[in-house]
Amino acid sequence: MRIRVLGCSGAIAKDCRTTSFLIDDDTLIDAGTGVGDLTLDEMRRIDRVFLTHSHLDHVAALPLMVDSVGTARGKPLKIHALPETIQALRAHIFNDLIWPDFSRIPSESDPFIQFREIAIGQ
C-alpha cells in the first residue's frame, strides 16, 4: 500500500494544503485542497473517496475534481461517508445552487458520483 499525503493542514497558504490522502492510485481519504495538485490523469484514476466528515477543509476539492474528470471517467466516483456527511453534501454543495448535483448528472441511471453510506467501525 502506498500513501501519498496531499494535504494535512486546516488552512491554506503557500505550501499548505487541507486534508487529503491518496491511497495507492485509486482511493482518497478526504478531498481537501491538496487534491488540486494532482494531474487530471491522477484524478481520473480515483475510484472512491472516503470522507471523515463534512468540514470544508476535508471536502473543498471534491466538487471541482468531479467537474474536472466526470465525463472522462466512464463510471461513477463512489463517495463513502456517514449518512450525516452525505446529507450535508447534498444540502450544501451538490444542490444545484452551489454546485450541480452530480448524483443525477448526466442522468440518474448513469451519474458522475454515487453516495455510499458507511457506519462508524465499518
Identify the meaning behind each predicted range:
Residues 1-122:
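Binuclear metal-dependent hydrolase catalytic cores
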